[in-house]
């Protein structure tokens, strides 16, 4: 697998996520139903953070696909394992987990709102936790290269920005406050 494959995957699935969100918001007369029991005061804090998270995503994206070479991305490895040239595969795994879970979240939530069930709740929590874990995973993957690759700390900062949204606000706070 090469980096171009990951690049095109992200560019194919990313717009589908935006379409799924647009479609999800259009599904209800009052789209605020997606907030569940999250207090309005917290919504006004979470929504701006979504833009911070998007900026963090773009910081990482720039490093992975424009700033670093194919070989530099291939050199990325987990902190607990040696470099083996499979950084692109690891990156694909993280992007697939993050993007595919992001793609199905709003539809799962819509189905849950229309007909609450334990299976629906578990599915929503699972995709949010998976997306949250993947958002942290980007920083974990880049961490061993933080002194070696130019701009690695920028990618780590981007992952942290994204992770605050996906792990804290979505997978933890929203899940605890939605009203399952």
Where are these regions (language model features)?
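Alpha-helical transmembrane segments and their helix-start/interface "positive-inside/aromatic belt" motifs
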Residues: 1-14, 44, 86-91, 148-160
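Alpha-helical transmembrane segments of polytopic membrane proteins
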Residues: 7-10, 42-53, 120-134, 156-162
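Alpha-helical transmembrane segments of multi-pass membrane proteins
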Residues: 14-28
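Membrane-interface interhelical loops and short amphipathic "cap" helices
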Residues: 27-43, 109-121, 174-180
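Membrane-water interface of transmembrane alpha-helices
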Residues: 55-72
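Membrane-proximal helix-loop-helix units in multi-pass membrane proteins
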Residues: 69-134
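Terminal transmembrane helical module of multi-pass membrane proteins
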Residues: 133-180
């Amino acid at each position: 697998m090469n980096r171009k494959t990951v690049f095109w995957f992200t560019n194919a699935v990313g717009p589908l996520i935006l379409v799924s969100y647009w479609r999800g918001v259009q599904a209800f007369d009052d789209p605020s139903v997606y907030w569940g029991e999250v207090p309005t005061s917290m919504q006004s804090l979470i929504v701006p953070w979504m833009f911070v998270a998007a900026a963090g995503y773009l910081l990482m994206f720039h490093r992975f696909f424009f700033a670093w070479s194919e070989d530099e991305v291939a050199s990325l490895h987990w902190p607990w394992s040696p470099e083996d040239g499979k950084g692109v595969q690891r990156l694909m795994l993280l992007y697939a987990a993050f993007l595919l879970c992001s793609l199905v979240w709003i539809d799962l939530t819509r189905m849950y709102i229309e007909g609450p069930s334990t299976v629906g709740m578990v599915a929503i929590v699972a995709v949010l936790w998976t997306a949250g874990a993947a958002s942290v995973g980007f920083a974990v993957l880049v961490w061993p290269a933080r002194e070696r690759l130019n701009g690695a700390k920028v990618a780590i900062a981007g992952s942290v920005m994204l992770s605050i949204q996906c792990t804290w606000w979505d997978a933890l706070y929203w899940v605890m406050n939605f009203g399952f």
